[in-house]
Regions:
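Generic signature of intrinsically disordered, low-complexity segments enriched in small/polar residues
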Residues: 31, 99, 121-122, 127, ...
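Phosphate/Mg2+-binding loops and adjacent switch elements
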Residues: 1-123
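Redox- and metal-dependent alpha/beta enzyme cores, enriched for Fe-S-associated oxidoreductases
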Residues: 139-182
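Short, solvent-exposed coil/turn elements at secondary-structure transition points
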Residues: 19-21, 60, 134, 176-179
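Short, flexible, solvent-exposed loop/turn segments with mixed acidic/basic and small polar residues
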Residues: 6-7, 137-139
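Short, solvent-exposed loop/turn segments at secondary-structure junctions
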Residues: 45, 62-63, 136, 154-156
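Conserved beta-strand/loop subsegment of P-loop NTPase cores
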Residues: 54-58, 83-93, 123-133, 139-148, ...
């Protein structure tokens, strides 16, 4: 039994869902053709596996929220602790589109620059990269077509804007809770 994210990832790479992270890593290592790289989601707080590279992906629109730890805020550990162990930060923006619409939630360059300054002010001197989501060519068949878009993800506007950026005519949106069972 697993969630939708693992099933989507399994379409493009060997994927394992395992509560016991070290056991999962050993499973990959025991494969006849083991991967040279293992990517863990939410692995920063797990000290049981040695890591070669720790990457923090930060939503460029939301930043770090109120800066507090769960349940008072969105962080899983204090920011100072995370910045000490992270090797690289990626500011994840929405679709790259110079002509954003008024409803697009993609942060402009000034918002991303503010985040870079924010992390630099806290002593983070390692690389900070800017990334984003770009639609794949699969959207070609939908371009110019009226579409009802529905999503059961944490921040559905980013998905809807990706469709719009890809040329899809989104006439209506329906939003469900994150990980909704369709």
């Amino acid at each position: 039994k697993t969630g939708d994210e693992a099933l989507l990832l399994a379409r493009i790479a060997p994927t394992l869902v395992c509560r016991d992270r070290p056991a999962g890593a050993r499973w990959f290592e025991a494969m006849s053709d083991p991967p040279s790289l293992i990517i863990m989601d939410d692995g920063l707080q797990n000290p049981s596996i040695a890591k070669m590279l720790r990457i923090a992906v930060v939503d460029a629109r939301r930043g770090i929220g109120n800066g507090l730890v769960i349940p008072a805020g969105p962080l899983r550990a204090p920011l100072e602790t995370q910045l000490e162990i992270v090797d690289l930060i990626i500011l994840n923006a929405g679709p790259f589109d110079a002509g954003r619409s008024e409803t697009d939630d993609t942060p402009g360059p000034d918002v991303q620059a503010d985040l870079v300054a924010f992390f630099r002010d806290r002593g983070f001197r390692k690389p900070i990269l800017r990334g984003g989501i770009a639609p794949r060519n699969d959207l070609a068949a939908l371009r110019g077509q009226p579409v009802l878009a529905y999503a059961g993800i944490g921040h559905p506007e980013r998905f809807f804007n990706t469709l719009r950026f890809g040329g899809v005519e989104v006439v209506e949106t329906v939003t469900y809770k994150d990980h909704h069972l369709f």
